[in-house]
């Protein structure tokens, strides 16, 4: 199956379960992590024909998604003597996808790259859309670029080796899309047998459907708003809170999808307090998150510090915090006129 991301410039296709043979008449640089290399690199290498292939592995995890690791990646790219016609392949989860895309965008002012995501989270979100970047002490993804891949290959077979925790984290991003764009997808999610899904014993078709539904939706959004000036901001539902949580826990306590799950609960509580969402809908999201073993609570130590951290969010401007809220489920809105008092009231409910 193929989904085209129809951008004015740099249009590309996402191939779902169609990774057969990749031929290049140039050098190829594969960026991965030790775990994915051990599990799947042999399979990938059997499908690639190129003048020369270089492989670099970096530590996995959001805590390593920083400028220090980026320097390592770039050094290995220079040592591999890549030129402007070389191709970088990001082979891993969201962290690898973000860093690989960023490295490709700045190496000699830009080389082509291909995403081959190996986690559900990367398939449904990180690998498509052209957002690249790294974290720093001030927050998540604050250093980065918009840089589109030449192609994306999502293989459901790679997902079979994921842990239940990683699968649940990917599901959180799918729930996010459903809650903000299409509540009929929530019906689909509620019908999934969570046991076989979390054990990765479900039919490949389930993974394929989740990936296809997500990518089709995200592709339409990115086509209308590639640089996140309006509609695309809705994809950040749950993320305004999640990014603060991740930063405050040094990116070590939660997987990104887990932080997003908590962020959605917080965003829904804010919407509930503002009369934009009813209690039944808020509870529905909690129930779906719990169904997949995702966290729904976080203890805020300092409400004032948490509030101030919002202003490092990329969606904020002129001392105004733009919150993405569901109102109702299946329809998102961006609200930038919420008083400090209302925000603080919601945050206090998580102390």
UniProtKB/Swiss-Prot annotation:
Catalytic activity reads: 7-phospho-2-dehydro-3-deoxy-D-arabino-heptonate = 3-dehydroquinate + phosphate
Q: Which UniProt keywords apply?
A: Amino-acid biosynthesis, Aromatic amino acid biosynthesis, Cobalt, Cytoplasm, Lyase, Metal-binding, NAD, Nucleotide-binding, Zinc
EC code(s) of this entry: 4.2.3.4
Cofactor(s) in the UniProt record: Co(2+); Zn(2+); NAD(+)
One GO cellular component, as annotated: cytoplasm
* Cofactor mode of binding and number, as noted: Binds 1 divalent metal cation per subunit. Can use either Co(2+) or Zn(2+).
- CDD domains referenced in this protein's UniProt entry, alphabetically: DHQS
For Zn(2+), which residues are the binding ones?
A: 173, 239, 256
Involved pathway(s):
Metabolic intermediate biosynthesis; chorismate biosynthesis; chorismate from D-erythrose 4-phosphate and phosphoenolpyruvate: step 2/7
Q: Which GO MF terms are attached to this record?
A: 3-dehydroquinate synthase activity; metal ion binding; nucleotide binding
Give an example GO biological process: chorismate biosynthetic process
**Keyword NAD among record annotations:** yes
Per the similarity annotation, which family is this? Belongs to the sugar phosphate cyclases superfamily. Dehydroquinate synthase family.
Q: Describe its function.
A: Catalyzes the conversion of 3-deoxy-D-arabino-heptulosonate 7-phosphate (DAHP) to dehydroquinate (DHQ).
The name of this protein is 3-dehydroquinate synthase
